[in-house]
UniProtKB/Swiss-Prot annotation:
InterPro entries: eRP_eS24_sf, Ribosomal_eS24, Ribosomal_eS24_CS, Ribosomal_uL23/eL15/eS24_sf. It comes from Takifugu rubripes. This is Small ribosomal subunit protein eS24. Coiled coil: none annotated. Residues 90-100 have a biased composition (Basic and acidic residues). GO terms for molecular function: structural constituent of ribosome. Belongs to the eukaryotic ribosomal protein eS24 family. Residues 90-132 are annotated as: Disordered. Keywords: Cytoplasm, Ribonucleoprotein, Ribosomal protein. Residues 101-121 have a biased composition (Basic residues). Component of the small ribosomal subunit. The ribosome is a large ribonucleoprotein complex responsible for the synthesis of proteins in the cell. Required for processing of pre-rRNA and maturation of 40S ribosomal subunits. PROSITE patterns: RIBOSOMAL_S24E.
Length: 132
C-alpha cells in the first residue's frame, strides 16, 4: 500500500436495521493512478477494526484531472448480514456468490416456450420443463 494515498470518509451513518455502517469515501491520490478497490477495502477495514471481507466498496468515480476519487462503502457487522443484504453481483465480485449458468440452448428454448402462452400461465411454463 502506498503512503501517499489518503482515504477519508464522510456522510457516515450507522444503519442498525441492516447491521452495517455506510459512508461516502473520498480517496486522495495526487499524481497517481486510481487506487484499486482491494486497497481501499483493506484501508477501510483497518480504520474500522474489521476484516476486508465484510467491507463492500462500489460506485467510484475519479474527478476530471485525477487526484481524487469518490465512491460508497458499507462495512457490515458480520459476513452473514452482508450475504443477506448485499446484491448478488457485489457478492460475486467478492467471490461469495456463484451464479448458475444455463446453456444458451436451454435459455432460448425456455424463451420460445414462454412466447407460446400469455398471462399468469407463463410462470408455470417457465418453471417446469416442456411437457410432451
Amino acid at each position: 500500500m502506498n503512503d501517499t494515498v489518503t482515504v477519508r470518509t464522510r456522510k457516515f451513518m450507522t444503519n442498525r436495521l441492516l447491521q452495517r455502517k455506510q459512508m461516502v469515501v473520498d480517496v486522495l491520490h495526487p499524481g497517481k493512478a486510481t487506487v484499486p478497490k482491494t486497497e481501499i477495502r483493506e484501508k477501510l477495514a483497518k480504520m474500522y477494526k474489521t476484516t476486508p471481507d465484510v467491507v463492500f466498496v462500489f460506485g467510484f468515480r475519479t474527478q476530471f484531472g485525477g487526484g481524487k476519487t469518490t465512491g460508497f462503502a458499507m462495512v457490515y457487522d458480520s459476513l452473514d448480514y452482508a450475504k443477506k443484504n448485499e446484491p448478488k453481483h457485489r457478492l460475486a465480485r467478492h467471490g461469495l456468490f456463484e451464479k448458475k449458468k444455463t446453456s444458451r440452448k436451454q435459455r432460448k428454448e425456455r424463451k420460445n416456450r414462454m412466447k407460446k402462452v400469455r398471462g399468469t400461465k407463463k410462470a408455470s411454463v417457465g418453471a417446469s420443463k416442456k411437457k410432451d
